[in-house]
Amino acid sequence: MINRKFIKHFESFSERSIPEILKKISIELKDDISKYSIIGYSNTFEFEYLSFNIDIKLSNNGSYYSNIDLLKIIKEPDISVDIVVYIPNNFDIDYVVATIIHEVRHIYDIYTINSENDMKSFVDDFYIRKLKIGNYTNFINLIYLSLEHELIARNNMIFPYIGSKNMNEKDSMDLVKSTFIYKSLDLLDSFDHISFVNSIEPNTLLKLTNIFIKDVSKDNKQCINIDDLILFYQKYEEYFKSLVSEWKLEINKEISKIYELKTYSNNESIIGGTHRLFIEIYNNIIYT
C-alpha cells in the first residue's frame, strides 16, 4: 500500500513536456519488457508514488490502444492501477512503451493535480461519455482528443517512442507524423461545422448541444435555433484549428529537446573519451 498523503508536487499539470520520472520509467519499462515475450507480458511496477500493473495483449484490429479506469483511481487512490495495453503482431517496442507512458502520464497527473483548472480536463472527460449518441459521437470524439490531459499524454509519448532510436531529427519528425500522436491533430483540423450540423436532426442536435453547454462549456447561454447551432460549432471548428497549430509546435519542441539532449550526451562522451586518452598518453610518458 502506497501512502499518497505526502506526495510532493514535482511539476504542475500545466507542464506539457514529459517529467523526468516518466523518462526514467520509460527506460526501465523497455529494459524489463525486452526480457520477455511481449504479448502476454504482465508485471507490477512501483516508482516513488506511482504504482501500476501492466498487461499486454494482442489487439484484434491490428492497432495500438490502451485503457485505465480513471474513476477507480480517484475513488481508490492507494490502489495499484491496472493498465491494459493492446498491440499488433508487428509491434514496435518503443511504441508499446510510449502507449504505456500515455496512461502513466494520466496517473501522474491525477496524483499531482493542484488546481481546479487542472481538474477540469478530467471532469469533462467524465461528462462527455454520456453524450456518445449517434452522429454526435463524432464531435464528442474530437472533444476527447482536445482535452488538455489527452494532448499532454500524447505529447509525452514522443520521448519513449523516438528517444532511443538511431535517427536524425527530420526522420524522427516524419516517424511521429505517421502515428496517432500527430494524426489525432489532423482529425481535429478536419472538423467541418456545417457538415456536422447537417448530419444530425435539428431538434436532436439542439438537445445534445444544450446538455454539452450546461455540463462542459458551463455557459448559461443555450442554443435555441439552427443559427445558434451553426455559430456554436463554427467556434469549435476555430478552436480545434488553433489547438492544432499550438500542439504541432509542441511536438516540434519535444522532438528538438530530445535531439538537444542527444547532442549534449554525445559531446559529453567525446569530451570524456578525449580526457581518458590524454590521461593514458600522460601515464605512458611519465611511467615508461
Give the label of every model feature segment:
Residues 2-16:
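Short acidic, low-complexity intrinsically disordered linear motifs used
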Residues 94, 110-142:
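Post-HEXXH active-site segment of zinc metalloproteases
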Residues 107-115, 159-164:
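Active-site catalytic microenvironments for nucleophilic, acid-base chemistry
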Residues 57-95, 104-111:
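Active-site scaffold of zinc-dependent metalloenzymes
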Residues 155-288:
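Pan-zinc metallopeptidase signature
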Residues 139-154:
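Active-site metal-coordination segments of metallo-dependent hydrolases
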Residues 100:
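A conserved beta-strand element that flanks and buttresses the S-adenosyl-L-methionine
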Residues 38-65:
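Amphipathic, interaction-prone secondary-structure segments
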